[in-house]
C-alpha cells in the first residue's frame, strides 16, 4: 500500500524481492534483486480509480495511503461497518462480515444509522437468516446503544481518531452534540489533539453526509 516505498525501492511487476520480518510478524520488502529482474518487468503506480466503485483516488496528505474519495463506495461502507461493530468499538455481536455484506448489497444499510432502523422483517429477507438469529442481531444492536461516547467516537472511523483520542474527546466534551459544535480552534487547544487531528474531526462533523 505504500507507493512511496515502491518508488524508493524501484519495485516492478515481475521482480524478485528480499523480505524480512518487521517486528515479529509483518513481512517487509527490504530490497529488489535487480540482477534477476526480468526484461519485461513493468513499473507501476497507485490506482487512479477505486476498483470497486470506479471513483477517483487520492493520496492521504498526512500519510502514505491511497484512498477512494467517494462517500457512497460500497467497499468503504462495508469496512466502516465492520470497524463500527467490532469488539473494541460498539461490540455488536452477531454482526459479522457475511451479514454486513448482505445488508449493504441489498441496500438495507447505507450508513451507521440504518443499523438502528433494521427490523425483524428486513433481517428475515436475507439468505440463511432464521428468526432466532435475526432476533439475536437486533438484541445486540439495541444493546450497543448503551456503549459509552468514547467507543462510539472510535467506531465512527474518523481519520486519525483512535481509542485514546476518542477517550480524550469524550472526557473533554461529554456529549456528541458539544463535540459537533466545537470549532477547529477549540479542538486544537485540547491536550494531545494536534492541528492535523483537530482538522480531521472538524471536517468530519461538518460533512452533511456524516450528520444524517
Say what each PLM segment does:
Residues 1-4:
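Short, structured beta-strand/loop micro-motifs enriched in basic residues and often containing a Trp
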Amino acid at each position: 500500500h505504500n507507493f512511496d516505498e515502491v518508488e524508493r525501492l524501484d519495485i516492478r511487476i515481475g521482480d524478485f524481492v528480499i523480505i524480512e520480518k518487521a517486528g515479529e510478524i509483518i513481512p517487509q520488502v527490504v530490497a529488489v534483486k535487480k540482477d534477476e529482474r526480468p526484461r519485461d518487468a513493468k513499473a507501476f503506480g497507485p490506482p487512479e480509480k477505486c476498483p470497486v466503485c470506479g471513483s477517483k483516488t487520492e493520496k492521504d496528505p498526512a500519510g502514505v495511503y491511497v484512498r477512494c474519495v467517494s462517500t457512497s463506495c460500497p467497499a468503504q461502507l462495508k469496512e466502516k461497518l465492520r470497524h463500527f461493530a467490532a469488539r473494541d468499538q460498539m461490540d455488536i455481536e452477531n454482526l459479522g462480515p457475511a451479514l454486513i455484506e448482505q445488508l449493504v448489497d441489498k441496500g438495507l444499510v447505507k450508513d451507521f444509522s440504518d443499523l438502528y432502523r433494521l427490523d425483524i422483517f428486513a433481517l428475515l429477507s436475507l439468505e440463511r437468516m432464521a428468526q432466532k438469529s435475526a432476533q439475536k442481531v437486533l438484541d445486540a444492536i439495541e444493546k450497543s446503544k448503551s456503549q459509552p461516547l468514547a467507543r462510539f467516537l472510535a467506531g465512527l472511523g474518523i481519520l486519525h481518531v483512535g481509542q485514546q483520542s476518542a477517550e480524550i474527546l469524550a472526557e473533554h466534551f461529554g456529549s456528541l452534540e458539544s463535540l459537533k459544535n466545537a470549532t477547529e480552534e477549540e479542538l486544537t487547544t485540547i491536550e494531545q489533539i494536534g492541528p492535523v487531528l483537530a482538522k480531521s474531526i472538524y471536517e468530519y462533523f461538518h460533512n452533511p453526509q456524516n450528520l444524517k
